[in-house]
Amino acid sequence: MQKLIVANYKMNGDVEFYKTVQQTIKNLKVKDTELVLCPPFVYVPNLKINRTKISIGVQDIACEETNKCTGQIGPNMLKEFGVTYAIVGHSERRQIGESNELVSKKVLTSVSNGITPIICVGEQSKQSSLNVLKTQVQIALSKIKTDKFVIAYEPVWAIGSGEIPTNNQINKAINIIKETTQKMGYNNIKVLYGGSVNENNYKDLLTTAADGFLLGGISLKLDKFFALVEGVDNA
């Protein structure tokens, strides 16, 4: 299966940074790997990338299409700027009260408008039961009838901590996610791994069942980030 790499820039960067991304990415050499760049909303217009296998995403999306959503940005607005992916349910959104039910609404809004949601799921601590993954997936997909989505497994305790699960733990989690989607009638779904992925461990993580990565911090180190992307493509 073709690998997918998603760069979540979170609340980082400025106009000059995204100009550098725009220029640097022209020299990126990828053949079989798809790359999605997710800058903050205000910098989406700064990334006009006319290349196959490189797409623009966002870090959140409105939960409804109504115009009565102060502070939200709807799918039709995003599509005007070439957005084709949206991260939904990231742990940092869940930490400020975003529920499984709200995630499911955002998933519906995305797929109803031709935007592919990247649905984030993950357990809070090393001791947490992985059954939470099953619940998160089932509720997230409860309102849709399409396989146009991606799931990103991010153990919350690993994000930005420098710690990562063992490969066996990652495989166990991904197997639970894929078994859940298969029982719901969705086959061949991409499941990414996210959480402290860097230039030193990505090759080992490629031996897991993950279909790619959701990246955070390393996305800001452009030389290392693009080297990682090319390394995945050549693996």
Model features per residue range: what roles?
Residues M1-A235:
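Active-site loop-to-helix "anion-binding N-cap" substructures in soluble metabolic enzymes
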